């Protein structure tokens, strides 16, 4: 516990809260260009090949975004839209790539939860 004199010399400083998605800069989404599309393996109890892409955003940030759903058409120089939302078992992946927007196609044969994967309503 500081003394009164110590508090006069240097007042208490509020701790700044850490932002979860700094690259978005308060925007709901940001556009970017894929610089690398690859697969990576998740943390310990899980096992898979998760599809991710390194994306250079319009504000200059370079982030890693997760590509949700089965199958994708992304490659280098694809223009994508990114939203916040981390992937718990992939360290460093704090963003999701939106399906069915810009160069990213929606998921084929998706019947449920279609809006999350940019899939049109089946006939």
From Swiss-Prot:
Keyword Cytoplasm: no
Gene3D superfamilies reported in the protein's UniProt record: Nucleic acid-binding proteins
Keyword check for Ribosomal protein: yes
Superkingdom of origin organism: Bacteria
CDD domains: Ribosomal_S12 (cd03368)
Any one Gene Ontology BP term: translation
3-methylthioaspartic acid PTM positions: 89
GO molecular function, one term: rRNA binding
Disulfides per UniProt: none
Gene Ontology CC: one annotated term: small ribosomal subunit
Family from the record: Belongs to the universal ribosomal protein uS12 family.
PANTHER family the record matches: 30S RIBOSOMAL PROTEIN S12 FAMILY MEMBER
Name this protein carries in UniProt: Small ribosomal subunit protein uS12
Origin species: Nitrobacter winogradskyi (strain ATCC 25391 / DSM 10237 / CIP 104748 / NCIMB 11846 / Nb-255)
